[in-house]
């Protein structure tokens, strides 16, 4: 009989749940509503995908991000899950076919935009089939106090109330204040929900802040991107003009870059995002205000060219890096001009004729100013950046994490003082020690294993190209790295690699095993 652990291993290829995931899965399977606040990259999707495969009926996932739906459904289909999405990126014929198949029971998981819940055709389908669970992703969009309020989210409750029997509900978000969480509970009418906030700590992310005058930022940006080699990254800018100028700057240095912002037409945005997902573009440059919903696990760096409006936005955007658990760098370039730009937008929002009462707009502006204050503190602090972020989100924080620019600057200063004293002592004794050779980084591969890893990348690229898939949907970088380290020689051994489920092992396993066998054989 299937259970959460067997589904996790068989379908997704993981031996164990991440912190917080198993409790959420158990509660949903027991019929208890859930409100989960989990940072970007913490594995929210597993929390509802696993129970969706164990519940008797269909799970509907409400998401505001069209591109994310496509990516998540694509990944599920690759893992052998019957999943589909329904949004305006489909033609009318495709929508009709998808709904027809949904009525016939083809799918276990269906992703929809919130507006789709109001469509008569979708409502008829939901009346005819058993809906076991409704999951609301990016649930903070339901709150006027959240940074991404969407009025269509307010009608989710009406849809749920219209169903023949009430499904269990899960609400997930990366960041939510107490006020926003209260709005989520109220507007979704969650019944005695299990509420959980998992750790916001992402140990694999290196945080860095750099003060730079506007005239210095292009040089700083180029230095950062060129240092990353061919690794994929995202650069966030505060205006569409800066996005376009930054793309031109990067392209002038032969860096494959593309833009993503609201002023581009939908086809261009979709093409640019696909180019990034399929590794035809190395760097995506996007506006802070325009959420990409990118689900690319091997993003190795995120650079904020401008300071975002608040730490909630910053952490969510920075969290796009390193979703595969491998080391990644998050750099913030800031200047006093950034603060003035954000204040301009706050004032503009306060004066906007949007139908809200003056006192409500004034309170919203006050809260925005408060959030900006903490964003500014983060940008200028001399103390541990990780500690500052964790403390802001209400979590116990270390005084020093050892993996941010402030901690390393303090350590390097101390090391320089020690080195200076040592050299002075050595000089007085008329001797100088030879510098020690640096030890290889923990977890680094041998030269032979690096060669094998590159061969595995090549196989993945070929297999993905044949199916017109992003490479990470075959296997992510962390999975290939573990293959290069452990060198499985059979399908059974391959199934012990994290991220290898049964369907993927059957579909792709032999191609990767042949490369590993050749590499091992050539060394003997």
Please provide the spans of the model-predicted regions.
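Short alpha-helical "packing" element that flanks the helix-turn-helix/winged-helix DNA-binding module
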Residues: 21-24, 375, 480
């Amino acid at each position: 009989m299937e259970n959460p652990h067997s589904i996790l291993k068989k379908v997704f290829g993981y031996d164990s749940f991440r912190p917080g995931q198993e409790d959420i899965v158990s509660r949903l399977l027991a019929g208890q509503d859930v409100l989960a606040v989990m940072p970007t990259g913490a594995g929210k999707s597993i929390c509802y995908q696993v129970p969706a495969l164990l519940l008797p009926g269909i799970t509907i996932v409400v998401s505001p991000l069209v591109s994310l739906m496509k990516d998540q459904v694509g990944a599920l289909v690759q893992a052998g899950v019957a999943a589909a999405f329904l949004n305006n990126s489909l033609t009318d014929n495709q929508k009709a076919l998808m709904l027809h198949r949904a009525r016939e029971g083809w799918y276990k998981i269906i992703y929809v935009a919130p507006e789709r819940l109001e469509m008569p055709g979708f409502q008829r389908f939901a009346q005819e089939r058993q809906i076991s669970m409704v999951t609301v992703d990016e649930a903070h969009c339901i709150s006027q106090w959240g940074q991404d309020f969407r009025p269509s989210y307010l009608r989710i409750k009406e849809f749920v109330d219209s169903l023949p029997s009430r499904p269990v509900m899960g609400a997930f978000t990366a960041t939510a204040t107490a006020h926003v969480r209260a709005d989520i509970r109220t507007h979704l009418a969650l019944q005695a929900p299990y509420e959980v906030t998992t750790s916001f700590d992402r140990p694999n992310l290196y945080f860095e802040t750099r003060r730079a005058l506007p005239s210095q930022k292009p040089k700083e940006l180029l230095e950062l991107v060129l240092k990353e080699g061919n690794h994929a990254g995202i650069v966030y800018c505060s205006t569409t003009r800066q996005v376009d100028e930054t793309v031109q700057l990067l392209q002038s240095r032969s860096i494959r870059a593309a833009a993503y912002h609201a002023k581009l037409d939908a086809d261009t945005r979709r093409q640019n995002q696909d180019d990034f997902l399929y590794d035809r573009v190395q760097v995506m440059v996007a506006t802070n205000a325009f959420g990409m919903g990118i689900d690319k696990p091997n993003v190795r760096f995120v650079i904020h060219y401008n300071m975002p409006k608040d730490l909630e936005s910053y952490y969510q955007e920075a969290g796009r890096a390193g979703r595969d658990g491998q080391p990644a760098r998050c750099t913030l370039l800031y200047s006093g001009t950034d603060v003035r730009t954000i204040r301009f937008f706050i004032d503009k929002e306060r004066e906007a004729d949007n139908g809200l009462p003056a006192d409500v707009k004034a309170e919203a502006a006050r809260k925005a100013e408060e959030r900006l204050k903490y964003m500014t503190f983060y940008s200028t602090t001399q103390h541990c950046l990780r500690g500052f972020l964790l403390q802001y989100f209400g979590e116990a924080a270390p005084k020093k994490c050892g993996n941010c620019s402030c901690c390393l600057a303090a350590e390097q200063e101390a090391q320089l003082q020690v080195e200076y004293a040592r050299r002075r002592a050595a000089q007085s004794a008329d001797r100088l020690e030879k510098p020690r050779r640096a030890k290889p980084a923990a977890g680094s591969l041998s030269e032979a294993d690096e060669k094998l890893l590159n061969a595995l990348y090549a196989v993945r690229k070929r297999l993905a190209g044949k199916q017109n898939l992003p490479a990470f949907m075959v296997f992510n970088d962390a999975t290939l790295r573990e293959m290069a380290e452990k060198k499985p020689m059979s399908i059974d051994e391959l199934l012990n690699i994290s991220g290898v489920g049964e369907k993927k092992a059957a579909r792709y396993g032999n191609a990767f095993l042949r490369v590993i066998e050749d590499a091992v054989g050539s060394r003997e």
